[in-house]
Amino acid sequence: MPMDKTFNAAEAEARLYDAWEKAGAFRAGANASRPETFCIMIPPPNVTGSLHMGHAFNNTLQDILTRWHRMRGFDTLWQPGQDHAGIATQMVVERELAKSGQPGRREMGREAFLEKVWEWKEQSGGTIVNQLKRLGASCDWSRNAFTMDPNFQRAVLKVFVDLYEKGFIYRGKRLVNWDPHFETAISDLEVEQVEVNGNMWRLRYQLADGATYRHPVAFDEEGRPTEWEERDYLTVATTRPETMLGDTGIAVNPADERYAHLIGKEVVLPLVGRRIPIVADDYADPSKGTGAVKITPAHDFNDWGVGQRTGLRAINVMSGRATMFLIENPDFTEGCAPSEEALALDGLDRYEARKRVVALAEEQGWLDGIDQDRHMVPHGDRSKVAIEPMLTDQWFVDTAQIVQPAIDAVRTGRTEILPERDAKTYFHWLENIEPWCISRQLWWGHQIPVWYGLDIWPARFEDDGDDTLDEVEIFELLEDGAFNHADPTHHCAFDFEGVSEKFLDDLASLPHPLNNARVVEVASRAEAIDRLAQALADYNLNEDPTHLVYPVWRDPDVLDTWFSSGLWPIGTLGWPEETPELARYFPTNVLITGFDIIFFWVARMMMMQLAVVNEVPFKTVYVHALVRDEKGKKMSKSLGNVLDPLELIDEFGADAVRFTLTAMAAMGRDLKLSTARIQGYRNFGTKLWNACRFAEMNGVWEGHATQAAPPAATATVNRWIIGETGRVREEVDAALAAYRFDSAANALYAFVWGKVCDWYVEFSKPLFDTEAAAETRATMGWVLDQCMVLLHPIMPFITEDLWATTGSRTKMLVHSDWPSFGAELVDPAADREMSWVISLIEEIRSARAQVHVPAGLKLPVVQLALDAAGREALARNEALILRLARLEGFTEAASAPKGALTIAVEGGSFAIPLEGVIDIGAEKARLAKTLEKLEKDMAGLRGRLGNPNFVASAPEEVVDEARTRLEQGEEEGAKLSAALARLSEIA
């Protein structure tokens, strides 16, 4: 059946992917013929996600490496999977419930809500898997993993318990990013900085005990004070007046002469009456604001640091919903008598409280002034609500105890990070690491395996010689609040059965009847108190010690998504079980990832795998850059410049999208993506398709089985192209081995389009009518087969379709053997001759184009001095040169005729007479005018780029665009200058 005229990507992609899956082409170990393994872990996309350009880029690079190793016979596994994406998924499901009019999360309760989440996951969670398939991702989908799968959950909980028991996980109170909308701590990666128009309020804090000081108010030209005024207050500046209720200090720089003598004194906090100290800290910058900084350790990360260094208290004055928490807050009222105005703020939203504080400051005279201020405010990337730094009880990993092996692994080369600059980022983060907050106040996720029970010890019970508690004693305990005020104690265990034993062990030392208690799980501390009180009362009625219950409740929080995804390499391979996959594929070979998650994911995987199994998770980390729009701007919905990879696949085909991303994947450099580039690479696929159609029409594959070795060839053209094929195979392998994806793509582009389609196909046409026809058919078939094989990792669909419709194949291209030949195929004599022929044709074409010779006009050529090798090459290839350079014929002369253009080649030169063909004077004038205008434009660009202010202050994409235009202009200028020089040589 003859080939179609064009490649129908939309039809072929679905058909071919289905065929690959049915053949088991992507399964681990498929096509393995050698003992080496190659394993790569997909960075698990969110189960809520859909394919964006970052995914398309990242997964294209992974697929190239996977297909390349699979074709080379490696035992290959590309492990796919999705992340449960705690906060994102919970948000999506809650939104769906609201849309459908169903009860909200809190109304239906945790268990029922989680059932809804699982229902949603089964119905909608596979979207991105299908989208990755459209891209051509050759993952082993039979092993598709999910971070909430039962086996993965076992791994996550075991690691938590193990690290807890080693002392690497603890519960503590620290400042975290708090999202008031979701009422949970979130990671730095889930915070986006938003620039807002706001105000800077200056507030006066009265010095305590009637203290005063001289404050400079006028200065001379050298900045020395010349006038002072007596003040009994300090002025501080803030963008968040509502937080002043939690102030516990004023920081001044110890080198600031204005305030140094006040260090150790106190001010009285307005509205609250709290006396707070003036402390010395370098965080206060004398050149910024008033030089005195209000310190609120519980609501600002910088202030928290000052508080830790200077011993200031941290007072949280907000609830989880960012409303003011004052009246029932013992920390707020301790040591002071807040005014009625302050207490009236209780329960107000933080922004409403801000207005009231400012109004009160103005009314009471401690508002010093207001300045407009444009500043950055952190927002939750999903809630779009301003983040509140919040002091809360959370679970933390003591990263300082597990970080060093992760640093050493990269320093010693056990794991290599490419490019090297990203290794520096990795080291910087890890060497300045903070405790990692791993708890989230959500329901969807890995619930923390910690159970709490009421801490009721023997000291609470009087020993009256009787092992039982009578009714009077029970009610006395209840009246005394033994249960209502009992502190919780906790135990960590893999499951409730394990933790029950720990609580029973603790009860062994308690007085009867508690030492015969049965441990049961309850929902909350309040329920635990009720259950224990009832159990004690029931005991006194029936005196049956086995009837007693000792209630415990589980920590309601879940683990940070990064905690579970940090175990992705071992968890997906079956750990903690000693599975064959774990033994075979771990540690993995390479991780392909974006620079934005080096710390959040890469560094944590390194730390956790080394802490858990004492092994690095991967040998190489390849960090790719961002995909931007064609002007270098970051893609965003607000700018309207987002390119949807699925829409691009619909329009241009997956192969064109993949090849574009690959060809632009220069290590460490952002991609500037345009549809014009993608269209150009679609044309590249069309070029290969047309070359194969030409070959088919000339019977190239008829009766020829696919062969790995090149055919025997005697014709110079055939010997030359066989050598070029060997060269490009070596180039592609070297590039892929070094993760220079762009070099591999560009080498293939130059070979397939340039050497094969533009030159070899044209050179071979006359040979089909000679005695070299059979050899040429065999050579062309072999060369085009190698094009398909070498291109397949980057352009899998069109190459597989060509493979299936040409020749006699024993297996699909996806499992075809990768060639091992190389530069040994180069025939030096054929290489020299055909390189000379190509050089001559290109020089003639270039000269014609530069001086605007009409494209269809055939010109005579005069052969000047030419060595023996050149004469032989010309004699053997004269007909080709005449046809492809559009020449009338060759004559020979000792010197160039008048009005001729000289062409220099290796071993000699030629002349092209132009007299009467073009108006040389007019052409020179045109070129000179064009060059003059271009030079003027270039001078302007050089001036802008030479201005440090422009380079420093202009948007990055504007500077990059100017540099690109200058580079392109200089290249065009060089061409124009060369053309002028050619014409100037004409006598």
Swiss-Prot record:
Entries under PROSITE patterns matching the protein: AA_TRNA_LIGASE_I
Keywords assigned by UniProt, alphabetized: Aminoacyl-tRNA synthetase, ATP-binding, Coiled coil, Cytoplasm, Ligase, Nucleotide-binding, Protein biosynthesis
Membrane-spanning segments: none
Xref: CDD domains: Anticodon_Ia_Val (cd07962), ValRS_core (cd00817)
UniProt: ATP binding residues: 637
Coiled-coil region list: 917-985
A single MF term (Gene Ontology): valine-tRNA ligase activity
Main location: cytoplasm
Subcellular location: Cytoplasm
'KMSKS' region (motif): residue ranges: 634-638
One Pfam family it belongs to: Val_tRNA-synt_C
Gene Ontology CC annotations of this record: cytosol
EC numbers, comma separated: 6.1.1.9
Family: Belongs to the class-I aminoacyl-tRNA synthetase family. ValS type 1 subfamily.
Name of the molecule in the record: Valine--tRNA ligase
Species name: Cereibacter sphaeroides (strain ATCC 17023 / DSM 158 / JCM 6121 / CCUG 31486 / LMG 2827 / NBRC 12203 / NCIMB 8253 / ATH 2.4.1.)
